[in-house]
């Protein structure tokens, strides 16, 4: 009789341990499945935020002839958004640093973006401004000067700048999206 009680208690204890182990195992499996789903359905991604601004006065636009070998040619001024900085403050700062002009009330008019090989996104917020103060001056980014808007297509534009220019000029467009197709960069204007 005592033997049967010990055996029953021992089996009960074993069953409890097995039950708890099974619950932990099932919970762990469900947790792993949850994490896998969360990773594949992630709503966040790594993004580099930058800006570019078309500063204009009448039929003239301010251009920057970039000297950076990685991205050289005619563009508009702009640069990176710093951590904790508002987008508008960033474009005002960048235009000032690269041109000496302090723009007033820049208007967001579109975006340019693409996905890098590492899966991160690069996003350029596009602004327009026609009010500014200050004296025009060059920076280490390159020479800045006024050009006739109509002459821009004949100038040596930086890579993919012609599509971006269309977003600046056409109110029906809001995005210049670059993507890889069969190993070649393609462009989609939306």
Language-model-derived ranges and their functions:
Residues 6-10, 17, 25, 32, ...:
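Short, positively charged and aromatic/hydrophobic N-terminal segments
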Residues 128, 137-169, 186-189:
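NUDIX/MutT-family hydrolases
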